[in-house]
From Swiss-Prot:
Binds 1 zinc ion per subunit. The gene is egsA. Pfam families: Fe-ADH_2. Catalyzes the NAD(P)H-dependent reduction of dihydroxyacetonephosphate (DHAP or glycerone phosphate) to glycerol 1-phosphate (G1P). The G1P thus generated is used as the glycerophosphate backbone of phospholipids in the cellular membranes of Archaea. It comes from Halobacterium salinarum (strain ATCC 700922 / JCM 11081 / NRC-1) (Halobacterium halobium). HAMAP family: G1P_dehydrogenase_A. Zn(2+) binds at D172, H252, H268. This is Glycerol-1-phosphate dehydrogenase [NAD(P)+]. Pathway: Membrane lipid metabolism; glycerophospholipid metabolism.
Length: 352
């Protein structure tokens, strides 16, 4: 008897384009969210976008509350929950980059209220997904949560964000290429459940960005449009799979371990981009697609070497040889690779 079932949670509204920030109230109304909004933001996004959103809610009498978080930590989540206890919000609105959106996402999931994502930078696929990433000490936790009910991505705002944040988002998407390879490998060798649809969507998104990398330029709304659509596709793939597998493989394990060994040296997206070069070499060898991955990253001004990441060669090798210890997730790294193998991969690809 067939007993398989799935529950796919997706955003109800994804609004992308020029000037859509001004439609915040209309988008929220269309999702049927009611009550007092609690806007979660951080210092720079507060000026860039959150004040606009707050003014819109004030204009219609929704009496928005605002909490400004400095960093993405569980303490920040607790702070938002404390504010929520005081104001009794009907829903949360995360305005900013990774910090504010992840904090709002986790807090709204805990409160069991709706959440609206308003990204001010295209720095990672968390703007749409049901995953939140929160560092704690030298460890970064990937936490499951409900995806946003709505996403409002203003390409004008995102195009004006620091270019390095956009290149980090691009690198995060490009790394889906090796994440899907790791997922398929885990399915073959460990019988890990695999979704053909989610895998194909994630791989197509990565390949699209690799093919168009040379056309993505700073301060162009057309470029912001392409990157945001790719981030949305990646987030949807994770929701379909009910797993981060479509967008997180050995390259993410490498990045998380690098966070422990050399904390604060580089952006997450840039680290997984370099990790993807290494992972593709490990998957396919010298004749694989690692050069295409590297060249796409380079055309975006994203790092492709340890030096460009700001980390030492030995730190890259240490992260690569111990990345399998991060979590119980089968990838091309298996139970770990030797330092000799790690050095060969990093040297052949020019990472070190």
């Amino acid at each position: 008897m067939f007993e398989k079932s799935t529950w796919i949670r997706l955003p109800r509204n994804v609004v992308v384009g020029h000037g859509v920030l001004d439609d915040a109230v209309e988008v929220v109304r269309d999702t049927h969210l009611t009550g007092r909004p609690l806007v979660v933001t951080s210092p720079t996004p507060k000026t860039v976008a959150a004040e606009n959103v707050v003014a819109q809610f004030e204009a219609v009498g929704d009496d928005p509350a605002v909490v400004v978080v400095e960093e993405a930590t569980f303490n920040s989540v607790e702070r938002v929950l404390g504010e929520a206890e005081a104001v009794d919000p009907g829903y949360l609105v995360g305005v900013g980059g990774g910090k504010a959106i992840d904090i709002a996402k986790l807090a709204s999931d805990h409160l069991n209220v709706g959440f609206v994502s308003v990204p001010t930078a295209a720095s990672h696929d968390g703007i749409v997904s049901g995953r939140g990433s929160v560092p704690e000490g030298d460890t970064r936790h990937s936490v499951s949560a409900a995806p946003p009910l709505a996403v409002i991505a203003d390409t004008g705002v995102i195009a004006d964000a620091p270019w390095e944040l956009t290149t980090a988002g691009c690198a995060d998407i490009i790394s889906n290429y090796t994440a899907v390879k790791d997922w398929r490998l885990a399915n073959r060798l460990q019988h890990v459940p695999y979704s053909e649809y989610a895998g194909a969507l994630s791989q197509m998104t990565a390949e699209m960005l690799v093919d168009n990398a040379a056309n993505i330029k700073p301060e162009l709304e057309e470029s912001a449009w392409v990157v945001v659509k790719a981030l949305v596709s990646s987030g949807v793939a994770m929701s379909i799979a009910d797993s981060s597998r479509p967008a997180s493989g050995s390259e993410h394990l490498f990045s998380h371990q690098l966070d422990r060994i050399a904390p604060g040296k580089a952006l997450h997206g840039h680290q997984v981009g370099v990790g993807s070069i290494l992972a593709e070499y490990l998957h396919s060898g010298q004749e694989g697609q690692w050069m295409a991955v590297r060249d796409a990253l380079a055309s975006l001004d994203a790092p492709t070497t340890a030096d460009e990441l700001g980390v030492a060669d030995d730190e890259v090798l240490a992260a690569l040889t111990s990345a399998h210890e991060i979590r119980d997730r089968y990838t091309i790294l298996g139970g770990g690779i030797s330092e000799v193998a790690a050095r060969e991969a990093a040297s052949r690809t020019g990472v070190i």
